Amino acid sequence: GHSGIDINKGRLNADTLMGRLLSGLNSEFRIVTLCGGFKDNVIPNACECVIATNGEISNCLAEFAKNNITDGDKGLKITAEKAEKADKCLNDKSTADVVKFLLGFKSGVMAMSQSMPGLVESSQNLGVANISGGYFNAVMSVRSSVKPEKQRLLDGIRSLAVQYGAELNIHGDYPAWEYRENSRLRDKMTEVYGKMYGKKPTVETVHAGLECGLLGEKIAGFDAVSLGPDMWDIHTANEHLSVSSAGRVYEFLRNVLKEL
């Protein structure tokens, strides 16, 4: 799912779930490979880990599934199969560090808005966790509508990097698009919508990054409204939108422009 819009829906993160699973194994093991998630702003729905062990893990997996899968997670599948013998694997310390990181990283809602009930203020998502070239890589997305809170989350990740002797790279930073209590553009669009459809539109705030935030930082007095067609299951393999609603958005936008 979308790491912003869907972050408060309680969906499991496959990467952090793998950490919980590995920490519960009662046999000694070393990690050979790890591959979970593909993008920082997507809640990962799959994670695969190859381990080297002399122990039997089937019973542990069954017990883990019994204790961790709820009625809301019926689509979750945990499978194990024998892999080919590996030539290389992580040492004991590196294996333990990877498991501790996956187990300890808080992925999800970090704070709710105090001014807008039900709106997520701050969140972080572990979108990618993999081992490549002998190195463990983790890619996260950090969001907040409050700049100091976003910095606090980044400082926490920076502290983790120091703790594990890791290199930290920050990229793709974008400013928050703060809600304007008084918006002439929003009022005009509400008026046009009412004329077209005979009812008021639903105006919502969302926990997601939008281009309006970037423009708002550069343009003094910037007033903006984001609109689009009906969409479902964003950032999933089942992502889709209503074509008919796209047509309605087009006509609505044309009428708004005529009024400006």
Where do the PLM segments sit?
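His/Asp/Glu-rich mid-to-C-terminal helical/loop segments that flank catalytic regions of hydrolases
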Residues: K9-S27, A96-L103, A111, Q151-S159, ...
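Midchain, well-structured core segments that form catalytic/ion-binding scaffolds
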Residues: G1-R143
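A structural micro-motif
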Residues: F29, I51, L76, A166, ...
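Zn-dependent metallopeptidase/amidohydrolase metal-coordination segment
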Residues: Q114, E121-F136, S141, Y193, ...
